[in-house]
Amino acid sequence: MKIVVLERNSVGTDIPVDYSELGEVTYYENTVTIEEVAERIKDADIVVANKAPMREESLKDAPNVKLICEFATGFDNVDIAYCKSRGIRVANVVDYSTAMVAQHTFALAFYVSQKLRHYDDYVKGGAYAAQSRFSNFDVPFTELDGKTWGIIGMGNIGRRVARIAESFGCKVIFHSVTGHSKVTEYEQVDFDTLLAESDYLSLHCP
């Protein structure tokens, strides 16, 4: 069985991507164009990709392809209708980055709310060591506690962010992108209300 990994560099080097026990594996660091895909997968049985265009144009001359595995949750790079017509299965990684995206959301929130750039520069530039006072409040910073955190898109990531925001003492409100959210533990509001009432707003939608 021939396995082709089109975008090895789309995942970190700390993540093992060794499929040799499954078959003959060919690795490419990156694959961008339809022409590159077509040339590299023409003899493949399984293709592992991320953003490489898996379209009819790139798949039509690869008669042996039976499975496309995505290094991601999304699969908008894959022509699903064409794959169905060929009997090619498509697999993705569901919920692979929920915790990390939520973590990064709060890293950004802290960066903004605590004015970390300003105070980091202030200390590293020597201004803090040179001042005669102990504290510096030249640029005000704020707590998350007591603030309203608005969320657009209450899927897996949105719900994880909501739980973390709540643990910091935030009131959580959200707007459903589809209008059909079944989430009941947080207040659902219309878009204008979300914008008017939120101190912090995070988007977790396509």
Protein language model annotation of sequence segments:
Residues 135-206:
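Rossmann-like dinucleotide/phosphate-binding beta-alpha-beta segment
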Residues 29, 71-72, 88-99, 176:
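Short beta->alpha connector loops at strand-helix junctions that form conserved
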Residues 76-86:
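Rossmann-fold NAD(P)-binding glycine/threonine-rich loop
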Residues 44, 62-65, 197-198:
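An anion/phosphate-binding loop that grips the pyrophosphate of nucleotide cofactors and donors
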